[in-house]
């Protein structure tokens, strides 16, 4: 009799715990925007549903589409790699919850060693000035010794699909910046072929394009400013030094997935996009020279180092320093933003709770669960700002 009562008590307590651990309701939120964020959203929303019971629907139509849909109140949240420059919504907060490198992927099957590119050469390729892979300007950068940082890493255990898995992530110092264990001095000598360059670019309104164009202008400002004099916009073809109609070797594509697919389809192809799109297509990516003279691969650690030198604005957006000597910095790293409604928008408070929980999950859990996607675990002052912005979602 006593045993039966004890079992009944345990069952009641267990049932109460399960109920209290479950969400009060299972809700659904809808988002729209950047293809830059799509790889991490696609894998992480499944885990979010398992952990919370809530469903996230996301349509990746580009940052411009996300900003438009958010402005028109068609979604519960947006995602954009760039801030609004006009047509501001009446109620808006930026939550910097995504960060990753914009990689330069290429298709040169005969080249078996990494390719190294300087900001000047990248500008000359994407402006149409360099049209062949064995151009002397590319060969000069890839001739001789280059300095490459090696970042410290550690293994952690996280739960994915209900199972404990081991992941490798960068080791951070007290300031939240990645630790560099050493520098490798590499003899750069790829056998660059006599193959025409075909440039794949985003033809849609794209925050990824805008951030890439900011790099092309910012990193070449000063002595090389003539290489990329135009101000960055979300439309690549509107921001090139010379109209693309002057060239036969430029191919537009709608979205990062199609840019990467285009590069894969053409020997000699080159394009830009979030690093996982090229990894998924088994394409190599270039190491990019930073202002300290180092050549850095597109990685979460290099992105973290670069963003750590940026200036955080009051609205949650970030200005990045292209001409600042930051050890280990990958200079085409970018923060990307959740577009969210603050309390003043008077949105459904229950949905707002889900939006806040989703952005917290993106900020704190997703990069650790899926480091292979290349996204940076945001830390330090930018993390604090992201948390403060998320707290405004009510």
Predicted segment positions?
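Sec/Tat signal peptide C-region and signal peptidase I cleavage site
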Residues: 18-26
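Flexible loop/hinge segments at secondary-structure junctions
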Residues: 25-394
């Amino acid at each position: 009799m006593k045993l039966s009562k004890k079992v009944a008590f345990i069952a009641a307590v267990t049932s109460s715990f399960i109920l209290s651990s479950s969400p009060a309701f299972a809700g659904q939120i809808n988002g729209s925007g950047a293809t830059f964020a799509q790889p991490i959203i696609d894998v992480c929303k499944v885990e979010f549903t398992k952990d919370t019971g809530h469903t996230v629907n996301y349509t990746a139509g580009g940052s411009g589409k996300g900003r438009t849909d958010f402005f028109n109140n068609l979604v519960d949240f947006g995602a954009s790699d760039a801030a609004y420059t006009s047509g501001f919504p009446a109620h808006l907060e930026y939550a910097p919850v995504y960060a990753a490198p914009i990689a330069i992927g290429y298709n040169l099957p005969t080249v078996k060693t990494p390719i190294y590119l300087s900001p000047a050469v990248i500008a000359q390729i994407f402006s149409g000035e360099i049209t062949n892979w064995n151009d002397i300007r590319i060969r000069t950068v890839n001739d001789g010794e280059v300095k490459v940082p090696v970042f410290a890493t550690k293994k952690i255990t996280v739960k994915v699909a209900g199972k404990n898995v081991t992941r490798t992530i960068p080791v951070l110092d007290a300031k939240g910046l990645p630790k560099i264990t050493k520098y490798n001095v590499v003899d750069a000598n790829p056998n660059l072929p006599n193959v025409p360059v075909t440039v794949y670019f985003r033809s849609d309104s794209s925050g990824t394009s805008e951030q890439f164009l900011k790099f092309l202008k910012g990193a070449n400002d000063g002595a090389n400013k003539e290489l990329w004099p135009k101000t960055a916009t979300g439309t690549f073809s509107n921001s090139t030094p010379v109209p693309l109609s002057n060239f036969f070797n430029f191919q537009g594509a709608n979205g990062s997935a199609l840019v990467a697919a285009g590069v894969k389809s053409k020997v000699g192809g080159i394009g830009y996009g979030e690093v996982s799109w090229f990894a998924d297509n088994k394409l190599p990516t270039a190491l990019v020279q930073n202002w300290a003279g180092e050549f850095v691969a597109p990685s979460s650690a290099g992105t973290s180092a670069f963003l750590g030198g940026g200036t955080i604005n009051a609205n949650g957006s970030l200005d990045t320093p292209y001409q600042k000597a930051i050890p280990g910095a990958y200079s085409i790293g970018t923060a990307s933003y959740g577009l969210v409604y603050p309390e003043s928008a008077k949105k459904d408070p229950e949905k707002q709770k889900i939006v806040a929980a989703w952005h917290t999950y993106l900020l704190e859990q997703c990069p650790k669960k899926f480091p292979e996607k290349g996204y940076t675990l945001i830390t330090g002052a930018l993390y604090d700002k992201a948390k403060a912005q998320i707290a405004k979602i009510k």
